[in-house]
Amino acid sequence: MTTFVDRVVLHLQAGDGGHGCVSVHREKFKPFGGPDGGNGGHGGSVSLVVDPQVHTLLDFHFRPHVKAANGRGGAGSNRDGANGANLVLKVPNGTVVQSGDGTVLADLVGVGTTFEVARGGRGGRGNASLANARRKAPGFAELGEPGDQIDVVLELKSVADVGLVGYPSAGKSSLISVISAAKPKIADYPFTTLVPNLGVVRVDNHTFTVADVPGLIPGAATGKGLGLEFLRHIERCAVLLHVVDTAALETERDPVADIDAIEAELVAYGGLVDRPRLVALNKVDVPDGRDLAEIVRPDLEARGFRVFEVSAATRAGLKELMYAMGELVTAARAAAPPAEPTRIVIRPKAVDDAGFTVEAAPGGTWVVRGTRPERWVRQTNFDNEEAVGYLADRLARLGVEEKLGKAGAQAGDLVRIGEREFDWQPTLYTEFVPGVRGGDQRLAEKSERPSATERLAARKARRQRPEDEAEADEPVGDGEE
């Protein structure tokens, strides 16, 4: 069974927010206790964090579906629901987070680096939080907002200073095993190395990391062999070391041709041309290997390569090679821009942008896009007339109706906000009219809704009624005595 996985697809689902509660306080001798519905809890978010003890994406290979906890719903007596627990996933250093279309969302380098991939939904407000001077006992509450749902691709790019490249069976694994404490699998057949191996090299004041990747063959940059899958592991390397087999049995191969073939693959892959190179002519302990190394060395040096004749078996020439790698790594680190100190700034969550746009769509439909309008629609219970009326008030105060009118929308046009569609009625007056709890008189049938004249007459009748009752209570006399 494989123990190394460097690419997985994750299906992430953040927690949904809990619904707000509709409740009215009931207690003896308190006939008007008022609303006491609590707010729903926020859903849990999904984050990635770099852990130094994790070296592979194997866990996600077997569990690709991840979901955070939902927020709990509110309850009466002003009891707020509990927030859903945030889910933190541990990933190796050097993990790249990409969206489904290949867009890089984050490059996680450095222990403790954290990235929030999916944010939990906001909890809905209970009717106690929605009460105001005019709407003293709301008969509705907000729904919890759904959490983010996203598919991401995680790719591991090993974080190493020196990358060992070369043909299969060139001796890369043997070399890394003697210059570091790494224990890769070593055998006398090609493609023994199937996963990258990392080792830490210490020589005097130099300490650096070396990566041994599977052997490359012509066409690796286009997918042949194992090169395409593992070439990304040397993208972060500051130095590349060509490991060349001087004792190869294939008569048609020679060290110069091997280096030319590997260089062609590195150029085809892209992004590796500017890295400094070293050449290690390996297996010079073999007589034929020593003779071949002496023949090709002048040609390689004429091309600008620093060449070292080494033997992983006898450890000949390894000291000079490690010093050269350490010097190049130190120079690369000095040339790199200084890392800015990390400042931890605690800020509240950003307030939703109040901006929105109104666009005409085919078929006489108008589309309203904006953070606030879309969130308000998601949190509205459309089975409750009073909640729908509250949504109409909020959209009107935000200026949605005014902007629709200026854009040319007509009564009865279809308006889409988020995933909901509405028939626009600009004549609906936007003032809360108290009525039955859970209802809104503005949404009643037109024949049932009293006109302004009828409402004025009703108010006059209510004022006149106490005067009529007072006159009826006056005693009636029998005349003069």
From Swiss-Prot:
Enzyme class: hydrolase
Annotated region (Disordered), positions in chain: 439-481
Superkingdom per UniProt: Bacteria
Span of domain OBG-type G: 160-330
Limits of the Obg domain: 2-159
The protein's name: GTPase Obg
GO terms under biological process: ribosome biogenesis
Leader peptide range in chain numbering: none
Molecular function terms from GO: GTP binding; GTPase activity; magnesium ion binding
Keywords associated with the record: Cytoplasm, GTP-binding, Hydrolase, Magnesium, Metal-binding, Nucleotide-binding
The organism's taxonomic lineage, starting at the top: Bacteria, Bacillati, Actinomycetota, Actinomycetes, Micromonosporales
Record: residues binding GTP: 166-173, 191-195, 212-215, 282-285, 311-313
Biased composition (Acidic residues): 468-481
OCT domain boundaries: 348-426
Biased composition (Basic and acidic residues): 439-452
EC numbers, comma separated: 3.6.5.-
Gene transcribed to yield this protein: obg
